[in-house]
């Protein structure tokens, strides 16, 4: 089990968000799956309101809209006794809206977004197709270990698979 310190923050006005212990367990599952558990790890997960997420996305990615998760990896210039992964900012209203639009349970989508963001902090990306395939497969495997179905399986695909 990963030695994990989580700084869990809720922005003012956020009343609907996963419990800290759940977020901790999702990050730990990601670290354990990747065997990133040989050193203590610290990260921050902030649940943000729409305006804050939009401002950060605009400032750091030049995209003037709120997105589901932003990752800010920390790259230390020196060896530290603990791995400081960085910060995740997850937009509560975007995650809740996406879950509804995609007909997923909100908690399953929250789990996916925390795992997805943690993978970004660990250096995974999805810009190129092969990177996306690798990252998505890791997400599927971690989610499956938590009893959550494939988040990339769309409702249309599910209908096709039952015919």
UniProtKB/Swiss-Prot annotation:
It is an enzyme of class 3 (hydrolase). One of its GO terms (biological process) is rRNA processing. GO terms for cellular component: cytoplasm. Its EC number is 3.1.-.-. Zn(2+) binds at residues 116, 120, 126. Transmembrane segments: none annotated. It comes from the Bacteria. Gene3D superfamilies: Metalloproteases ('zincins'), catalytic domain (3.40.390.30). Binds 1 zinc ion. Keywords: Cytoplasm, Endonuclease, Hydrolase, Metal-binding, Nuclease, Ribosome biogenesis, rRNA processing, Zinc. GO terms for molecular function: metalloendopeptidase activity; RNA endonuclease activity; zinc ion binding. InterPro entries: MetalPrtase_cat_dom_sf_prd, YbeY, YbeY_CS. Single strand-specific metallo-endoribonuclease involved in late-stage 70S ribosome quality control and in maturation of the 3' terminus of the 16S rRNA. This is Endoribonuclease YbeY. It comes from Idiomarina loihiensis (strain ATCC BAA-735 / DSM 15497 / L2-TR).
């Amino acid at each position: 089990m990963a030695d994990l310190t989580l700084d869990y923050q809720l922005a003012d006005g956020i009343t609907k968000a996963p419990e800290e212990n759940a977020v901790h367990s999702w990050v730990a599952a990601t670290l354990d799956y990747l065997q990133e558990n040989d050193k203590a790890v610290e990260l921050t997960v902030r649940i943000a309101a729409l305006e804050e997420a939009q401002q950060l996305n605009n400032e750091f990615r030049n995209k003037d809209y709120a997105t589901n998760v932003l990752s800010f990896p920390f790259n230390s210039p020196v060896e530290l006794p603990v791995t400081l992964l960085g910060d995740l900012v997850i937009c509560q209203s975007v995650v809740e809206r996406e879950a509804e639009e995609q007909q997923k349970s909100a908690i399953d989508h929250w789990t996916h977004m925390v795992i997805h963001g943690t993978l970004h902090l660990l250096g995974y990306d999805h810009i190129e197709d092969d990177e996306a395939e690798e990252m998505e497969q890791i997400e599927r495997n971690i989610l499956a270990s938590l009893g959550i179905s494939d988040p990339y399986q769309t409702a249309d695909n599910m209908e096709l698979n039952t015919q």
